[in-house]
Amino acid sequence: MSSQVSYLSTRGGSSNFSFEEAVLKGLANDGGLFIPSEIPQLPSGWIEAWKDKSFPEIAFEVMSLYIPRSEISADELKKLVDRSYSTFRHPETTPLKSLKNGLNVLELFHGPTFAFKDVALQFLGNLFEFFLTRKNGNKPEDERDHLTVVGATSGDTGSAAIYGLRGKKDVSVFILFPNGRVSPIQEAQMTTVTDPNVHCITVNGVFDDCQDLVKQIFGDVEFNKKHHIGAVNSINWARILSQITYYLYSYLSVYKQGKADDVRFIVPTGNFGDILAGYYAKRMGLPTKQLVIATNENDILNRFFKTGRYEKADSTQVSPSGPISAKETYSPAMDILVSSNFERYLWYLALATEAPNHTPAEASEILSRWMNEFKRDGTVTVRPEVLEAARRDFVSERVSNDETIDAIKKIYESDHYIIDPHTAVGVETGLRCLEKTKDQDITYICLSTAHPAKFDKAVNLALSSYSDYNFNTQVLPIEFDGLLDEERTCIFSGKPNIDILKQIIEVTLSREKA
């Protein structure tokens, strides 16, 4: 199979980009996100043909549908995929765990940084290196193309990006994270990496402040042109593409168990990237009847699917001086006010429901109007018919902090299995789904996004009262032993300020290249 897919911007200002251009640019010049010119279909008979394939083999098949052979040959792509997933600790890469309550937990945390983002960022790091090596060939040092990756993290993206890019030639990586708003393990995973091309920057604010700074960097045409800015956040299409694989792989796992008559996926999500990959899988032909969004108390997605209003802050997050920051929860990777990837889905929604002739140009015009209204007013409301169409694709649930802790307890009591707080948001949502559909024969797959050791505060809060529980012996991996005591390197930037950030990047790059 070989793809002829090209890439276009959701805002309509850029089209006919190659896969390489979409990956290296990350964000289109008009501020839009890259999407494929068409969604390819899974080949006829794919279930029987792929059911016994390994995770890397399925990843190769999926990526071949989106990457033209003229850009990356079959042999080159296979080597990239195999290299990317050889770093995972489990032979199945993303294994399924069946719980006694009937839920199936898809363990996505067996990569180098113990988080689902390794699935995408191990591949993306190798992809960056592949493209740059090809571009640079034997060029002298002062003529080589150099990529400056700038990303924001609420915890897991940062460490996964760093582990995917550390030591890569012709790549520098700058990761912004909110001071005091990531877990100690997450911060240590980032700041203890000593490779000279890795730079961590703390911001006195929240994740959305970091994400806004990254967007401003991408929006600065001159700065972007000078430093060749690249993206590792889920705005980068390659991340979404990589994540499609585990939806197909897990479906085939339950298919082989004879449990695939009605399969539904539950996805804890804040930025909408993880579940968007499931949407693409469904559009490609994956026979799943439902995608279930699980949010924490920062519930912009849940509120949209309940009301049709996409609104940055709810009434509890508004002060006399205006909207305030995301609520601090036990699932910090989802403490997000604005879901960056939701723009991609809104484009497809506009194409299907609002574009008179269902053309990409019309969809981009409508999407741009929605996003401009959202930027101006902090809210945008879609028509009831549009909301009805959205509800055919997704349903959603909101899980509170207390319910998150209770879910960790429930699964420990029933299965002696320990889940992290983000997975707990998904599991609690799954328990509600099971209750609502208890008379139906449905297979639920809940995505488990991180290893519980990364969130000791929440896990210990939930389980410390159990006499048979011991964090160090039951949860803590040997890879984390002593990590908190290692020497750290970090740049403190103070309050969010784009000029200070640009100065930090320029000074650091000049030192790195000296």
UniProtKB/Swiss-Prot annotation:
Which CDD domains is this protein grouped with? Thr-synth_2 (cd01560)
Q: Which residues are modified to Phosphoserine?
A: 319, 321
Q: Per UniProt, where does pyridoxal 5'-phosphate bind?
A: 270-272, 274, 449
Identify which top EC class this enzyme belongs to.
Answer: lyase
GO BP terms in the entry: threonine biosynthetic process
Q: Give a short account of what the protein does.
A: Catalyzes the gamma-elimination of phosphate from L-phosphohomoserine and the beta-addition of water to produce L-threonine.
Protein name (Swiss-Prot/TrEMBL) = Threonine synthase
The organism named in the record is Schizosaccharomyces pombe (strain 972 / ATCC 24843) (Fission yeast)
